[in-house]
Amino acid sequence: LTTFKLGFLDEALKEWGKLDIGTRDQFKKKLAERLTNPRVPAAQLSGSKDRYKIKLRSAGYRLVYEVRDNALIVVVVAVGKRERNAAYKAATKR
């Protein structure tokens, strides 16, 4: 079983740093699962082959990551509130 490494774009790391501990822990759990199975069809972002989302419904947060098979790395592209699709809009610019 291949385990991917986890990386962050600089902007995403800043966003990650602003999350409260509880939200961060929830994302950590989900990210740990995705590192062994990053390509979840239901979580794929439309119009993007390698980008996927993680939703935290209770906290109202979204995380967008990109799978880079050649480097075996999952890169967090954006983290943000669900309102106005903030995370998705940020991700498209990165």
Regions found by a protein language model. Name each.
Residues 1-7, 11-14, 18, 25, ...:
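Enriched for short, Lys/Arg-rich terminal
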